[in-house]
């Protein structure tokens, strides 16, 4: 039996070169699932995405998903894509195994915590305050550079990574410190900034919003002193005071100390984000 992809709709195109299309997964012309492919506007038309790959239950565990994934990669190659991205639910063990077997490498993961009714107290002696306008410009330049470098370190071309960083700050901090729903705080040691926390809100799933940690940074000289934990507890307080019951974040693969911290605070991984070169 032959597994193929058959277009289920016309090719959708955007003025900036973006593409998307839904395909039926077929076995000898019999529909057994569906695939949705697109290009990623955050990284440009050369970065493809398998947004969804579904095989109907009766046809699972027969290699249909693997063949459909490989066929999807060929479609993305024909679009001029040089990489493909996927986001797999953390509890989808079969899909995660398939991704690893096909050569996908984890780049990052999304994590979420269900918040307690009472916000946590900050550790004794920890001083935090809102960021000032005088501090904002230097912080933003450093934050964008660090965010871009994290993507570069994981195989994203420098130009795409820097575009992604600029786009993220433009989207989520359009008015700087005055952006509605955004808070940027500083943790202070001996009167000097020792770390920063940027929080806001995000749509975790369609129609479902939650508080979100966009960035957290502790100065290298101050690490190992509990400031990262204190800033995360502050994020929980901010979220609960705003009425949110969940707090989400995004962490890059390989940042083991951060992942361990988040897990110790009760965060669980919801999505594993991976990529593969198509060259």
Where are the language model's segments positioned?
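Active-site rim helix/loop that mediates acceptor-substrate recognition in acyltransferases
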Residues: 2-28, 36, 159-184
């Amino acid at each position: 039996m032959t597994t193929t992809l058959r277009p289920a709709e016309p090719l959708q195109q955007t003025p900036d070169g973006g593409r998307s299309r839904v395909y039926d997964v077929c076995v000898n012309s019999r529909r057994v699932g569906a695939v949705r492919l697109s290009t990623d506007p955050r990284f440009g038309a050369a970065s493809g995405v398998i947004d969804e790959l579904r095989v109907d239950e009766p046809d699972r565990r027969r290699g249909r998903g693997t063949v459909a994934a490989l066929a999807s990669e060929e479609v993305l190659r024909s679009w001029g894509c040089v990489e493909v991205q996927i986001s797999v639910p953390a509890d989808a063990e079969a899909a995660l195994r398939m991704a690893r077997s096909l050569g996908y490498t984890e780049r990052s993961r999304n994590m979420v915590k269900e918040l307690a009714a009472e916000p946590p107290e900050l550790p004794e002696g920890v001083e935090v305050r809102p960021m000032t306008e005088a501090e904002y410009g230097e912080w933003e330049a450093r934050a964008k550079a660090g965010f871009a470098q994290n993507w570069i370190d994981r195989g994203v071309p420098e130009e795409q990574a820097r575009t992604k960083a600029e786009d993220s700050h433009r989207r989520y901090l359009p008015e700087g410190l005055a952006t509605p729903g955004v808070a940027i705080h500083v943790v202070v040691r001996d009167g000097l900034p020792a770390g920063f926390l940027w929080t806001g809100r995000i749509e975790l799933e369609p129609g479902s919003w939650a508080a979100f940690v966009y960035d957290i940074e502790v100065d290298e000289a101050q690490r190992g002193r509990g400031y990262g934990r204190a800033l995360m507890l502050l994020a929980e307080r901010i979220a609960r005071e705003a009425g949110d019951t969940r707090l989400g974040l995004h962490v890059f693969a390989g940042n083991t100390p951060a992942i361990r911290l988040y897990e110790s605070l009760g965060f669980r991984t919801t999505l594993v984000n991976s990529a593969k070169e198509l060259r």
